Amino acid sequence: MTSVKLDLDAADLRISRGSVPASTQLAEALKAQIIQQRLPRGGRLPSERELIDRSGLSRVTVRAAVGMLQRQGWLVRRQGLGTFVADPVEQELSCGVRTITEVLLSCGVTPQVDVLSHQTGPAPQRISETLGLVEVLCIRRRIRTGDQPLALVTAYLPPGVGPAVEPLLSGSADTETTYAMWERRLGVRIAQATHEIHAAGASPDVADALGLAVGSPVLVVDRTSYTNDGKPLEVVVFHHRPERYQFSVTLPRTLPGSGAGIIEKRDFA
């Protein structure tokens, strides 16, 4: 099978003189081709020689740009075959509730976590109605691979979880999750979770956390987790960079029980 390759004649790889290193400019130009799907996932990057001829840059500069994108997770090197656009992280919803950390580790990706903020305060109305709480502990964490952000994760928790939450606030605890807090440290089993998925424009704080322009499209997932008796435990909101993360679900034609499966909501306003 012939792999898809970037059309260099149509690609904008112009490099300008200025304070931004040429390698960074080339890396950003190639990244733009990936985001715009002119070079789709699984597509092969042009050869080093082709990139040199097209960009007018040196071999060292081209290698630095490609290496930068490899470290950020945009490209993967396959021995004897070339360099290819990396597949996005895929979360299969029909195989049970998994944390983003579990999904990434299953894909061979070791996440890094930045704790951006944590504070107790008034719950937003929707969160208050869901959890039945006036105040919540809000924890904002950024998930990344290398220096490339994947998702902004905002967890709304009961303020009385106490010391059990401390590992979540440690920047070195990259594999810590709210589920680990509930199940391992508090002995509360997660029975099920609802996922509401929609697209939105990045707000200023989301854009800043994910390295995007304000208003850029992001994939938003609202996850509400419940105990066996149907009590809501937490609400976690994920803002994903859409080119780096995707969801997949396999369903039978019919599902037993009310509320089972996927419910489509349309807003034509």
UniProtKB/Swiss-Prot annotation:
UniProt domain comment: The N-terminal domain binds DNA and the C-terminal region plays a pivotal role in dimer formation.
Domain HTH gntR-type: 20-88
Induction of expression: Binds to its own promoter and probably autoregulates its expression.
Activity regulation, short description: DNA-binding activity is increased in the presence of L-arabinose and inhibited by the small molecule I-OMe-Tyrphostin.
Sample GO molecular function, one term: DNA-binding transcription factor activity
DNA-binding region location: 48-67
Assembly behavior: Homodimer.
Listed GO biological process terms: negative regulation of DNA-templated transcription
Disulfide-bond pairs as recorded: none
Keywords: DNA-binding, Stress response, Transcription, Transcription regulation, Virulence
Organism of provenance: Mycobacterium tuberculosis (strain ATCC 25618 / H37Rv)
Function: Transcriptional regulator required for survival in oxidative stress and for establishing infection in host tissues. Regulates the expression of a subset of genes involved in oxidative stress adaptation and virulence, enabling the bacteria to adapt and persist in host tissues.
Name of the protein in its database record: HTH-type transcriptional regulator Rv0792c
